[in-house]
Curated annotation (Swiss-Prot):
It comes from Acidithiobacillus ferrooxidans (strain ATCC 23270 / DSM 14882 / CIP 104768 / NCIMB 8455) (Ferrobacillus ferrooxidans (strain ATCC 23270)). F(1)F(0) ATP synthase produces ATP from ADP in the presence of a proton or sodium gradient. F-type ATPases consist of two structural domains, F(1) containing the extramembraneous catalytic core and F(0) containing the membrane proton channel, linked together by a central stalk and a peripheral stalk. During catalysis, ATP synthesis in the catalytic domain of F(1) is coupled via a rotary mechanism of the central stalk subunits to proton translocation. This is ATP synthase subunit b. One of its GO terms (molecular function) is proton-transporting ATP synthase activity, rotational mechanism. It is found in: Cell inner membrane. One of its GO terms (cellular component) is plasma membrane.
Length: 159
């Protein structure tokens, strides 16, 4: 026996162990490492996809917020345009109503002027007739100052 304790069995066991390690490395560790690398890559891809999804979600949310703001702005613009158009239509209608009222008032004033002139003409005719009648009465009577004043007062009263 050898003082270190190395004998043939130990060498055979060592060679068998090295062969076993070499076989395990070649047939087990290589495929296992490939599976683990594939799994690591798959997990990394999944994490990257999740990050991209998160970014896309944030981008979609931002876009949705922008679209909502644009829609609100557009709605506010439409409402403002409708209100402005309503004011324009109301002012236009009021302007037309004023024009119509002015036209009616002008027509009524013209008619009043015509009727006033007719009434004046009728009154002139009546005054002329009264003056003629009064003159005839004066000429038919013998007039003194008192009678003359009485006749004039009566004619003025009739006017």
């Amino acid at each position: 026996m050898n003082p270190v304790g190395i004998n043939g069995t130990l060498i055979v066991q060592l060679v068998t162990f090295v062969i076993l390690v070499a076989l395990l490395y070649k047939y087990m560790y290589g495929p296992l490492r490939k599976v683990m690398d594939d799994r690591r890559a798959k997990i990394a891809d999944g994490l990257a996809a999740a990050e991209r999804g998160k970014e896309e979600m944030a981008l979609a949310q931002k876009r949705a917020t922008e679209l909502l703001r644009e829609a609100k702005d557009k709605a506010a613009e439409i409402i403002a345009n409708a209100e402005r158009r309503g004011v324009e239509l109301r002012e236009e209608a009021q302007g037309k109503a004023r024009e119509e009222a002015d036209r009616i008032i002008a027509s009524a004033r013209a008619e009043i002027d015509v009727e006033t002139n007719r009434a004046r003409e009728v009154l002139r005719g009546q005054v002329v007739e009264l003056v003629v009648n009064g003159t005839q009465r004066i000429l038919h009577r013998e007039i003194d100052d008192q009678t003359h004043r009485d006749i004039i007062d009566r004619m003025v009263g009739q006017l």
